[in-house]
Amino acid sequence: MVDTSNLLPQTPRLLKVPLIILNIILWILGLVLVIVGGICVSFLSNFKDFTKASDAKSALSNLTTSIPAGVLVIGILFVIFTVVGCFVAYKEKLVGLVIYCAVMLILLVILIGVGGKAITLHNDDIINEVGGAWEHVANGTKNSTLTRLENFLKCCKWSNVSIDSSDLCPKDGDKIKYEGHYCGEALSDQFSSKIYAVGAAGLAIGIIELVAILFSLFLIIRICRSPRTRSYDQY
């Protein structure tokens, strides 16, 4: 039988230092997730009234709340648990490392799920979904929500062939503002930059997190195999 005991460093120190460094990197990236998620939540919060006024509530709410809110929450948890990870690694707390591994593994699954969902969203499908809802709202009683959206996106009408009236466009006196700047194009640019950034950041951080989990598992194994005095604090 192959002896695997020599495959790991002989002292926990050689494992905990890289683990602490990885946690510091993940803490910084957690702040990035908080910032990116906050920007997306702030941007997509402008679609709240529009989502309520449209028939595609479930599809649009998933886009406008689930993904950005998920990224924001994950970022906050990262900031908290990476600090915990640094502490338990430095102190070589065995039980703390086990709990840290379990929590980070759960976060890894969620992060890859959210990041994968964001990065696989097809921009054309999103725009078609929003475009259909846009025309529905334009013909409804709550079409004033479009004026607020157009003012936010600095655009007028969904496209040059859409049926929504330019009467809903923001006006500067009698002059229509943003004429010729269509909302479909403006929204497409915004989604391309924000949603894909969320997905790419999530997957990249997930890879680094996986390495950190492996180091913490190796550290747990090495601590268990290391000789300890009676006063050794394994908790």
Curated annotation (Swiss-Prot):
Keyword Transmembrane (UniProt): yes
Keywords for this protein: Glycoprotein, Membrane, Transmembrane, Transmembrane helix
UniProt superkingdom: Eukaryota
Transmembrane segments: 19-39, 69-89, 94-114, 201-221
InterPro entries hit by this protein: Tetraspanin/Peripherin
GO cellular component, one term: membrane
Glycosylation sites: 62, 139, 143, 160
Family, as annotated: Belongs to the tetraspanin (TM4SF) family.
Annotated protein name in UniProt: Probable tetraspanin tspA
Lineage summary: Eukaryota, Amoebozoa, Evosea, Eumycetozoa, Dictyostelia
